[in-house]
Amino acid sequence: MTTASQTPVGDGPGPRNAAPAGDGPGTSGPVPAGSHGPGRRRSAADLRALAEEAGERFADATAEEVLTWAAEEFGDALAVACSMAGDTVLPHLVAGVHPGVDVLFLETGYHFAETLGTRAEIGTVLPVTVIDVLPRLTVAQQDEQYGTDLFSRDPGACCALRKVEPLGRELAGYEAWVTGLRREDNALRRHAQLVEWDNTHHMVKLNPLAGWTFDDVIAYAGRHGVPINPLLTDGYPSIGCEPCTRRVEPGEDPRAGRWAGLAKTECGIHL
């Protein structure tokens, strides 16, 4: 089994971290600094054409069919982004066709203890390589530079610093990424395709769970013994950083507990 603790960067045991280094993504060539990916072999134009063709071909495919194709097409240039919330079935699905796949976890420094526990369990029981993707600033450094509790004063800026920029830096070394987007989450995600072009990161984006419901996710996890975040069944159908997430009331949008009381509904990594 390949896990973060058994396959670190460098020598000796320890967690595999994406050190904050280097600048933005390129379209092809050597591995960008700050990414664990193998680098991009194809140009953005070639990847876009591939995404558009596959989007049509797999419009009505199953998650397994899409991921089998992706594993064959991209190999180690395929990464999974997992929040260790409602998407832990993703590493299980991808590992079934591509054992050892890199699973990117945005370690913001503000996670629920339950989320960190789920991350540790996934890295132990599944044949995947969990990579902690780190912001350039620690929480203490961010507090010193921007003032304490930036998340309460400017949540958009906090998400940009702790999620959007780190993920973009890490994805620059891959050609395709797998996400846990589901159409039922909210109106902004209603038209998510199984395979699509990511115009922000200039790469192929796969949403194999797009047509799944919350109940589908829980049922799959139960059938296959996949660890799930215990908060999911405790009133948190959508889980983000602890200071910005509350329980969802019956009848509310699944993401109503994220940034409650604000117009903000997305952290920015899917925009």
Give short role names for the model-derived ranges:
Residues T2-L271:
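Nucleotide-activated chemistry modules centered on ATP-dependent adenylation/adenylyltransferase
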